[in-house]
């Protein structure tokens, strides 16, 4: 490549431009472009490339949210509250799983989407729940927490190796 001339690539259309610029498959880009238009698709593709927050779920069977926030803040972690009661974002998560609070099971590292699955299901005490694709166990333990460790949860996963993870996290 010449230092004097910048490399220019001409793409066929907006779908190709967006797909290349945001590093998404063409079929994915085309689907949203055709259904929702260029501006929505740009926003969606850009959002897909953003780094998600580091989220933890408070284990309310062992500690309340405010106490965990206080403990983690005093330990030097910057905590951002979310609109969801027992989900917190940790802005500087390095070393958080080495804390006594993690060791004692006061929180579980879990993506907000997974937290919301259990939250929206909203099982009551003594419920019976079938958790498919349960590994590594975050949703399973959250369901148990929401059920106050009562009821029955059947946790399944197609991978035998992943079943071990569920047991370790229980």
Segments predicted by a language model, with ranges:
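S-adenosylmethionine
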Residues: 1-170
């Amino acid at each position: 490549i010449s230092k004097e001339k910048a490399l220019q690539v001409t793409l066929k259309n907006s779908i190709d431009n967006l797909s290349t610029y945001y590093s998404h498959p063409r079929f994915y880009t085309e689907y949203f472009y055709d259904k929702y238009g260029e501006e929505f698709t740009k926003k969606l593709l850009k959002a897909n490339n953003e780094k998600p927050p580091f989220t933890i779920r408070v284990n309310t069977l062992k500690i309340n949210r405010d106490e965990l926030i206080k403990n983690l803040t005093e330990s030097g972690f910057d905590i951002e509250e979310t609109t969801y009661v027992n989900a917190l974002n940790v802005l500087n998560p390095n070393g958080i799983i080495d804390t006594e609070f993690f060791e004692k099971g006061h929180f579980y590292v879990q993506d907000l989407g997974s937290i919301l699955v259990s939250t929206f299901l909203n099982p009551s005490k003594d419920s019976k729940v079938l958790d498919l694709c349960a590994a590594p166990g975050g949703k399973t333990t959250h369901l148990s927490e929401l059920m106050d460790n009562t009821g029955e949860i059947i946790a399944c996963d197609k991978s035998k190796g992943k079943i071990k993870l569920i047991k370790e996290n229980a």
